[in-house]
Amino acid sequence: MAINILVVDDLAFIKIVLRDILEKSGFRVVGEASNGEEAIRLYQEKRPDVVLMDITMPGMDGLTALKRIREFDPAARVIICSALGQQRLIVQAIQLGARDFIVKPFQPQRVVSALKKVLNII
């Protein structure tokens, strides 16, 4: 059974990099969003196993989307993707219910280990 992932980032390049890492590691990308509003809509529509979500995006940011997704589904598994130097935002995301975080630029093994951690596949 494939594990379904929703990728949320406003940069097309980041979505391409994540899709490549995920698909090469046996995960299935079931949707891609460019902002928080799209992320919420796709989460409700696709019900992915995990969301990989950027913090800083135009329109609704990742923290607000995380909060709304967790209100809709308290069991939602969200991993925050952040740039170096965003420690305060990472702490805020964890307090809002993010299960883990990964830092850009992505290391494929870190992406996979974060997914396995939140899915309890170790």
Model segments located where?
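Acidic catalytic/metal-coordinating carboxylates
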Residues: 35-38, 61-64
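Receiver (REC) domain active-site loop signature in two-component systems and cognate sites
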Residues: 57
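Active-site beta3 strand of CheY-like receiver
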Residues: 46-52
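Short, conserved "switch-loop" micro-motifs in signal-transduction and mechanochemical regulators
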Residues: 84-85
